[in-house]
Regions:
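A short beta-strand element within the Helicase C-terminal
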Residues: 175-178, 220, 383, 390-406, ...
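Conserved segment of the helicase C-terminal RecA-like domain
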Residues: 418-446
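Walker A/P-loop
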Residues: 92-116
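Conserved helicase/translocase motor-coupling segment
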Residues: 279, 284-363, 367
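Conserved helicase ATPase core of P-loop NTP-dependent helicases/translocases
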Residues: 131, 135, 144-155, 335-339, ...
Length: 471
């Protein structure tokens, strides 16, 4: 009796199994409801490979795709590292490729779509990126490019989907694509997004990211879902070649007296509570323990307010506004991106200097208008909280100022990447404004633990200094 494979809501149903045939496969379980064996759809490749190796005949009703050709309508001349990455990935047709922002991840994907020749679903985190991918794919392929997300449900042989929309549709579309591409694939191990990979039978998988590492250590799950990290190249290896040469400078800013006084009072209250409650952030669950302890008493709740206040004062010190103005004056004629940790500070800077501000609240038409004006030079400065951290193409930016940020290494590398797209004669500058003698210094040290920042300068508080002359 032949085995029969069927796709069912993100899983594979296996009928006609004889005793012991699938004993070596993890994840294959007996389902009393359907009276057959069942396994996650992501195990399709391993299942089919095992059946063929054991010369077990089977009928494949699960797969609803076949080989296709996607001829390129314009020639690609890959850079040497893109060619290397393509060759390494093609050897197994699974794996994660880590390239810096601006190094041509999308072009690499175009190359691999053409070489693989299977219906392809590309996952992206935002609607902006979905449209950006469609624009590039349409430039290289004659075939229609489908979209899934933002109210659009147009499935084609090459389709770009947001992670959210792909998740919604994977239970009934998980057998229609042979190649999955996960852009910004560090999102994939998220509690929900992982099911977009688990629920698909696609045997070929490509993860693309500038920073595969995750704060929660779930890289192992990423590699399980996509394949191993098969190729990696770093920002410093491409600086001055594929990417613009760059300098990163940390400027310690002395807080205004009133801000400093409030900061010290709030921080003392917060630190005293940590000691009294015996909370240590060196503990793996230190933050969770802190939140629990602060919720247990009025004193704890006051300590939490003090924590938020001292953090806000260090990140949004008025002295940083003064220093930002100096940098704006210094870099007249350049294209500058100003990054903040939160929307409040972004809008505050926008009001003070009459600058356009991009946040997640900015409507799409206004966002597109701001980005277009930035590219043409009508708006030489854009202020943003987090929406430009990831993916949005701003090739004309050559100066970045981080007024405030998290301790995330990924966020920091992404912000640097926003200003590194090469053009003739370009020299990129990234400034970090850090309040002197505050907890923000530790945050800065934590997020700089990446080779892209080795050897970069930390400048003392020197108002009026010509920073561009310091190396």
């Amino acid at each position: 009796m032949n085995l029969n494979l069927h796709f069912d809501k993100g899983t594979i149903l296996i009928y006609g199994v004889e005793e012991g045939q699938l004993s070596q496969l993890d994840g294959v379980v007996w389902d009393e409801r359907t009276l057959c064996y069942r396994t996650p759809a992501a195990d399709y490749r391993q299942l089919v490979t095992t059946l063929r190796e054991q010369k077990i005949s089977f009928q494949d009703h699960a797969r609803k795709f076949s080989a296709e050709t996607f001829p390129l309508k314009k020639k690609i001349t890959p850079r040497s590292f893109q060619q290397e990455a393509a060759e390494v990935w093609m050897s197994e047709q699974r794996g994660v490729v880590s390239l810096p922002t601006g190094a041509g991840k999308t072009i690499l994907a175009v190359m691999l779509i053409e070489k693989t020749g299977r219906p392809t679903l590309i996952h992206v985190p935002t609607i902006d990126l979905m449209r950006q991918w469609k624009e590039v794919l349409s430039e290289y392929f004659d075939t229609p490019i489908g979209l899934l997300g933002g109210g659009i449900n147009d499935i084609q042989a090459i389709t770009v989907a947001t992670y959210d929309s792909a998740l919604i549709h994977v239970t009934h579309q998980g057998n229609q694509f042979g190649l999955l591409i996960f852009d910004e694939c560090h999102h994939l191990p998220g509690e929900q997004y992982q099911f977009t990979a688990l629920g698909s039978i696609a045997p070929f998988r490509l993860g693309l990211t500038a920073t595969p590492e995750r704060a929660d250590g779930k890289e192992a799950l990423l590699y399980e879902l996509c394949g191993p990290l098969c190729y990696e190249i770093h920002i410093d290896e491409l600086s001055g070649r594929t990417l613009a040469p760059y300098v990163v400078e940390t400027i310690e800013v002395e807080m205004l007296p009133d801000d400093r006084e409030q900061y010290e009072i709030a921080r003392e209250r917060y630190i005293n509570f940590l000691r009294k409650a015996r909370v240590s952030f060196n503990h793996p669950n230190g933050w969770s323990i802190f939140l629990r302890r602060t919720s247990e008493s009025p004193e704890g709740r006051e300590a939490f307010k003090a924590y938020l206040l001292q953090k806000k004062l260090s990140q949004a010190s008025g002295a940083k506004i003064d220093r930002l103005w100096e940098l704006i004056q210094l870099h007249q004629g350049d294209r500058m991106l100003v990054f903040t940790q939160d929307n409040e500070m972004a809008y505050r800077i926008g009001r003070i200097f009459l600058l356009p501000v991009l946040t997640h609240h900015t409507k799409l038409p206004e966002r597109e208008a701001f980005l277009k004006a930035f590219r043409t030079g009508e708006y030489p400065i854009l202020v943003t909280s987090k929406v430009l951290n990831e993916g949005v193409d701003v090739p004309d930016a050559n100066v970045g100022v981080i007024v405030s940020g998290s301790g995330s290494i990924r966020e920091h590398v992404q912000r640097l990447g926003r200003i590194l797209r090469a053009r003739p004669g370009k020299q990129a500058m990234l400034y970090e404004l850090v309040s002197e003698n505050t907890g923000e210094l530790f945050t800065n040290q934590r997020r700089r633990k990446h080779r892209a920042y080795e050897g970069t300068a930390v400048l003392p508080n020197q108002s009026g200094q010509n920073y561009s002359e310091i190396n």
